Swiss-Prot record:
Organismal lineage: Archaea, Thermoproteota, Thermoprotei, Sulfolobales, Sulfolobaceae
One Gene Ontology term, aspect cellular component: cytoplasm
Subunit and partners: Tetramer of two alpha and two beta subunits.
Name recorded for this polypeptide: Phenylalanine--tRNA ligase alpha subunit
Positions that bind Mg(2+): E391
Gene this protein is translated from: pheS
């Protein structure tokens, strides 16, 4: 079975029996590179034979040379514009544009013009440069030589290339009827399809690659988690990246002399923020001074930090004294750290909050199990844990194939020291999940930095879940 281009070459060789690759390219209109590959295919089929192969140097027009062949050389155009009469430099510059400097330089070098003040005086009324004549000859197939070739090379109007030339002989004639690609309705109704030869389809070949746009795979994962939470009856809430220490630490019953507040564990922002109503501030102060036994500072509570935990959003929600709520937030948090394959200075967390009158610790465990099973973790277990603002507290583990039991989240019932100053007296369950670590487990990512990659080839290779 022969392709259309193979048939073109064979039809050409039938008339000559023997020809060069360059003659074949000119006679068929095919690119020389295509001719070489088709000849190799035909030779492998035993239809043609390569008699000889040689490499020769050929002169070819550059892109600049092709342009000058069509438009004319700048010095020729300048002489034509002068037409035997003096003209101001500015007039010529306006007419020739960026070609003026080139044309003016070559025209003076060739003695075609002189310059008096700002006026160009022609010394000839007409001029066609030998270089232009050589360019036209080359276009017609006659290569330049000698001094003209040297000038054209210096002016980058031509280039000398090494070109392979094959001499090919037709060994046997074959039927050159083109293969049909499609069966038409007419062929089926008339039965004429039996008279045709059809090009076979390779059903095992990969389809062509189409680089279509798609959602960033990590963003897609986050959206899937959000959809799951909404499906479980939660509402999404959000907060600001810049937060006061009051909501980031104080409302969460974390003392002001806690090491986490030091500059090495939080990004401190210059300036002070505003505090909520004085009643909430007073109650938080009383709780800190009663249980932590130190003098609580309102000025310290007004300090600004880049939030180090999305629990700051939970604290904001609590400050509104909701009677009943099922809320979650997913967002970035910021902590000083050494960046490597498992650590970043900014990453995503998810915090959840449930406030219900009869909510129990057992309900919290059931909710967490529903979340992780919704994410595809079939086996979930719990271990006692400790967190500053929950009691009792629990660590959540999920079984991941190939990794075993992996810590997934921390959770617990919020302490009364956290909820009651905000006016919340119903049980409140809360949890925090490292979304980046979770995504690495589910997506098979080894380096956390790849979750934020902007490398197009890498992103194209990622499967969107």
């Amino acid at each position: 079975m022969l392709s259309e281009n193979e048939i073109k070459i064979l039809d050409f060789l039938k008339r000559r029996k023997e020809s060069t690759s360059q003659e074949i390219a000119e006679g068929t209109g095919l690119p020389l590179s295509s001719v070489f590959s088709i000849i190799a295919t035909l030779e492998s089929k035993g239809i043609v034979k390569v008699i000889s192969e040689e490499t020769r140097k050929v002169v070819r027009l550059t892109d600049e040379g092709k342009l000058r062949t069509e438009q004319g050389l700048p010095e020729d155009r300048l002489v034509t514009l002068l037409n035997g009469r003096p003209l101001k430099i500015q007039e010529l510059r306006n007419a020739l544009g960026k070609d003026f400097e080139i044309g003016f330089g070559w025209a003076r070098r060739k003695g075609l013009i002189t310059l008096e003040n700002d006026t160009v005086i022609p010394k000839v009324s007409q001029y066609v440069s030998p270089e232009y004549t050589a360019l036209k000859d080359l276009q017609a197939g006659k290569e330049p030589t000698g001094e003209v070739l040297e000038i054209l090379l210096r002016r980058k109007l031509v280039e000398v290339k090494e070109e392979k030339m094959l001499r090919v002989q037709l060994l046997r004639e074959v039927e050159t009827r083109p293969a049909e690609l499609y069966v038409t309705h007419e062929m089926l109704t008339t039965g004429s399809w039996r008279e045709y030869e059809f090009k076979p389809y390779n059903v095992e070949a990969n389809p062509p690659f189409f680089p279509i746009g798609k959602t960033h795979y990590f963003r897609d994962f986050i959206e899937k988690v959000k959809d799951l939470m909404v499906g479980l009856g939660f509402v999404e809430v959000s907060g600001d990246f810049v937060e006061t220490e009051f909501f980031n630490f104080d409302m969460l019953f974390q003392p002001q002399d806690h090491p986490a507040r030091e500059i090495h564990d939080s990004f401190v922002i210059e300036g002070k923020g505003n505090l909520p109503g004085s009643d909430l501030v007073r109650k938080v102060k009383e709780v800190h001074e009663k249980w932590w036994r130190y003098s609580w500072s309102e000025d310290n509570a007004r300090r600004l930090v880049l939030r180090s935990q999305t629990t700051a959003v939970t604290a904001r929600v609590l400050s509104g004294a909701p009677k009943r709520i099922r809320a979650f937030t997913i967002g970035k948090v910021f902590r000083p750290d050494s960046i490597d394959a498992t650590h970043l200075i900014e990453f995503h967390q998810m915090d959840g909050l449930v406030i219900e009158e009869d909510f129990t610790f057992r309900d919290l465990l059931s909710t967490l199990r529903d979340i992780f099973q919704g994410l595809g973790v079939k086996q979930v277990k719990f271990k006692p844990g400790y967190f500053p603002f929950t009691e009792p507290s629990v660590e959540v583990y999920g079984f991941i194939e190939g990794l075993g039991w992996v810590e997934m989240a921390g959770a617990g019932l919020l302490r009364k020291e956290v909820t009651e100053p905000a006016g919340v007296f119903s049980p409140a369950g809360a949890w925090g999940i490292g979304i980046d670590r979770l995504a690495m487990l589910f997506l098979g990512v080894k380096d956390i930095r790849d979750l934020y990659s902007l490398d197009i080839e890498y992103l194209r290779s990622r499967r969107v879940i």
